[in-house]
UniProtKB/Swiss-Prot annotation:
Record protein name field: Large ribosomal subunit protein bL34
InterPro entries: Ribosomal_bL34, Ribosomal_bL34_CS
Gene (UniProt): rpmH
Keywords: Ribonucleoprotein, Ribosomal protein
Family designation: Belongs to the bacterial ribosomal protein bL34 family.
Renumbered residue ranges of the record's region Disordered: 1-44
GO CC terms of this entry: ribonucleoprotein complex; ribosome
Domain of life: Bacteria
HAMAP family cross-referenced by the UniProt entry: Ribosomal_bL34
Pfam families linked: Ribosomal_L34 (PF00468)
């Protein structure tokens, strides 16, 4: 059985990246939440 995590920089950015987050209303909510919490890294 293959492992579920097959690293791929492009997919990681497309799915979890900053611009992906900014492109939707809920994604912006995620960033706002993480800023409020004081996360050093906001997105992938």
């Amino acid at each position: 059985m293959k492992r579920t995590y097959q690293p791929n920089k492009r997919k990681r950015s497309k799915v979890h990246g900053f611009r992906a987050r900014m492109s939707t209303k809920n994604g912006r909510k995620v960033l706002a939440r993480r800023r409020r919490k004081g996360r050093k890294v906001l997105s992938a």
